Amino acid sequence: MLKKKIIKTHANHTNDTGSTQVQVSLLSSRVAQLTKHLNNHKNDYSSQRGLKKLLGQRKRLLKYLFVKDPLGYNNLIIQLGIRPGKSLVN
């Protein structure tokens, strides 16, 4: 249900489920869930590893989006409240 809502808000067209914006939004949602989980379970190292993998994937997608569509990148990081990457800031 949450996934469909995220897809609907960030999709470019009605059947868009795989665009970069949608993928980053879904990863950001999962990152928020894992962060909340890790606040309660500090020693859950497998979840910490999973969180790091998700953050790396999101970082790669954001870098791709910055190269292909800088305006879309800026809009997305503002909507999601993500800080711009260090290597992407002039």
Swiss-Prot record:
Disulfide-linked positions: none
Any one annotated GO CC term: chloroplast
Keywords, alphabetical: Chloroplast, Plastid, Ribonucleoprotein, Ribosomal protein
Entry keyword annotation includes Chloroplast: yes
Pfam family, one: Ribosomal_S15
Record GO biological process: translation
Subunit record text: Part of the 30S ribosomal subunit.
Family statement drawn from the similarity comment of this UniProt entry: Belongs to the universal ribosomal protein uS15 family.
Stated name of the protein: Small ribosomal subunit protein uS15c
Species of provenance: Mesostigma viride
Gene behind the chain: rps15
